Amino acid sequence: MQLNNLKPADGSKHAKRRVGRGIGSGLGKTAGRGHKGQKSRSGGFHKVGFEGGQMPLYRRLPKRGFTSLTKAFTAEVTLRDIERLEAAEVDLLVLKQAGLVGELVKSAKVIKAGELSRKVTIKGLGATAGAKAAIEAAGGQIEA
């Protein structure tokens, strides 16, 4: 292989369509646009969602829902995640360092998903009733 012999793979490059250059080209006369109508004219396109003056679908349907402003700042952590951690004390900083929650997270909650087989102390995190029971059953505790 030499630099002067490099060429694109077969079929990776396509020739530009040259329209309106005679009948023999297959794209002459109307140039693939059909006959008459708005879409055959130059500049003859409408914006996305335009329905010819009829009230468009996106305006006929009601607005729904909202974007939560707190979503980026709260997180959930499972018992399964905590089981994988080496730390005996788990707080928000430990979770961030382990990559279990994002850097922007201000508060996290432990939820009961998976099992916990060792003693763990949870500091400064919320916990569901099921998670709290599982942590205490394993000999751990939750500190505010």
UniProtKB/Swiss-Prot annotation:
Keywords: Ribonucleoprotein, Ribosomal protein, RNA-binding, rRNA-binding. Residues 1-48 are annotated as: Disordered. One of its GO terms (molecular function) is structural constituent of ribosome. It comes from the Bacteria. Residues 21-31 have a biased composition (Gly residues). GO terms for cellular component: cytosolic large ribosomal subunit. Part of the 50S ribosomal subunit. Binds to the 23S rRNA. Belongs to the universal ribosomal protein uL15 family. HAMAP family: Ribosomal_uL15. This is Large ribosomal subunit protein uL15. It comes from Cupriavidus metallidurans (strain ATCC 43123 / DSM 2839 / NBRC 102507 / CH34) (Ralstonia metallidurans). The gene is rplO.
